[in-house]
Swiss-Prot record:
The keyword Metal-binding is annotated on this UniProt entry: yes
NCBIfam families: GSH_gloB
SUPFAM superfamilies for the chain: Metallo-hydrolase/oxidoreductase (SSF56281)
Cofactor(s), by name: Zn(2+)
The name this protein goes by in its record: Hydroxyacylglutathione hydrolase
Keyword Zinc applies: yes
Gene3D superfamilies the UniProt entry points to: Ribonuclease Z/Hydroxyacylglutathione hydrolase-like
SMART domains: Lactamase_B
Amino acid sequence: MILKKISILSDNYVWVLLNTSGSCIIIDPGLSEPIIQEIERKKWRLRAILLTHNHIDHTGGTRKIIEYFPKISVFGPKETRQHGVNKIVSHGDRIILLDKIFYVFFTPGHTSGHVSYYSQPYIFCGDTLFSAGCGRVFKNKHLEMYRSIKIISSLPDSTLLCCSHEYTLSNLQFSMFILPNDNFIKLYLKKIEIKLKLGQSSLPSYIFFEKKINLFLRTNDNYVKKSIGLKSTCTDFEVFKRLRLKKDFWS
């Protein structure tokens, strides 16, 4: 299986999984034209679309893609029904595509119906967990987001994190604001600055690596707790919520 991505809008990625025979699936097509053009240019055969949630930068191209490829399956949670979904998914579902099993995880927090798709070694998690960060939390659903991130971070360390936005640099800058003396994050920040200047991507990342650079996965770290004014006895969730609120105001 080959993993590719198509850049759209200002910082979105549409992920593509492709097998050796040229059949493919795509995840969260926020636009239609660049996706259709790439599929036609590469002579791929689109089999399915997977949607993680209902925000327009993840779903905006779906209906036109369906018009162009009317036989495809479109999977998504209930909140994405208006975007042409013909197969509603929920937590615990198993989907077989391209001879691979995709497990559906309910990962709310960013939206109330957000889902993620796991097919070893890939986790397509939309706007839940980002490299060095996590998605915005709406309607004060911090506990839901915390639990969703726990689901993703509990996957094997070798799992490839395929999130939907190129936010890594900004997230690392926030991490340095919180932990200015973390040399590992400092070095990685410099590396990402160089990659982005060269027109390269920071994604995908690995779960094991995220546990080092992503403060939202370091909620039991006493250095993190101290840096945001919490006692060492506080809960991991308290750390998560404080970090997320700080990130909201920082950015």
